[in-house]
Regions:
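Bacterial N-terminal signal peptides that target proteins for export
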Residues: 2-20
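Residue-level signal for alpha-helical transmembrane segments in multi-pass membrane proteins
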Residues: 24-28, 145-148
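Extracytoplasmic electron-transfer domains, predominantly the class I c-type cytochrome c fold
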Residues: 43, 48-51, 108-112, 138-209, ...
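Secretory-pathway/luminal and periplasmic proteins that interact with or process carbohydrate-rich
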Residues: 123-126, 146-150, 224-225
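Post-cleavage N-terminal segment of exported redox proteins
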Residues: 2-5, 25-123, 184, 217-227
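Local sequence-structure signature of Cys/Sec-based thiol-disulfide redox active-site neighborhoods
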Residues: 125-136
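Generic anion/oxyanion-binding catalytic loop in active/binding sites
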Residues: 101-102, 126, 200-203
Length: 227
């Protein structure tokens, strides 16, 4: 059928109706062809796998999540928090992975701890696998009042030991806080199932000696953190 456009007013309602019908059909087809959540996850996995490659010391196996990260990622994506019961199970599982100091000494040199907290080097494809990693702690926390450049994703750690009443880190009274601090740095998910804090010791970001120095930075009464 050939339409005549001699009269604009006579054909306008017809054209509007046709346009509306086309929009409805497009909407219906769009809804019918939209992938479900599982399909979207599969598509995303495919995109991720084809978008990254091994380079230098960095391997694509870093993209493989363990159960803790996977469950928390799903909870974040769906907006449905992990149940309190499941969160407790995740925390207990991660607590079992905490490696306590082999020599029984929890505190190291706070000066070395400050260097580690300041450094964000390590674990990138331009880094040497033999170099010591930094903790990059200032990226998320205020730690000393001298450093004015810090992130706020995590809570301020300034006066960390002082406000917790730790005057002698080697005392029996300070033991619970000292052990908690070590465990939190080693594997943060042992105390908060879906913590955003990197599991520094568990993930091999920091070694035992480095964790000891960072604990010293936070708890040594002589550290600028507690002044």
């Amino acid at each position: 059928m050939k339409l005549s456009f001699k009269s604009r007013t006579s054909t306008r309602p017809t054209r509007l109706a046709a346009l509306a019908a086309a929009c409805c059909v497009t909407a219906v087809l769009g809804c019918a062809s939209s992938p479900n959540s599982a399909a979207l996850d599969q598509i995303t996995d495919g995109v991720v796998k084809t978008s990254f490659r091994d380079q230098g010391m960095v391997k694509v196996d870093r993209l493989v999540q363990d159960d803790s990260n996977r469950e928390c990622s799903i909870a974040d994506a769906t907006g449905k928090p992990v149940s309190s019961e499941r969160a407790k199970q995740i925390e207990e599982a991660n607590l079992r992975t905490v490696k306590w100091p082999s020599d029984g000494k929890f505190l190291g040199d706070w000066r070395e701890g400050e260097k580690i907290a300041q450094s964000g080097r390590g674990l990138t494809w331009t880094d040497d696998a033999k170099m010591a990693n930094g903790g990059n702690c200032y990226n998320c926390h205020q730690i000393t009042k001298e450093e004015i450049s810090f992130g706020t994703i995590g809570p301020s750690l300034y006066n960390y030991g002082k406000i917790r009443g730790v005057s002698d880190p080697n005392s029996a009274a300070a033991k619970p806080i000292v052990e908690y601090t070590w465990g939190k740095i080693w594997n943060s998910k042992a105390y908060n199932a879906c913590s955003n804090m990197p599991r520094a010791g568990h993930a091999g970001i920091l070694n035992e000696a480095q964790v000891r120095h960072v604990v010293g930075l936070l708890l040594d009464p002589q550290s600028p953190v507690n002044k």
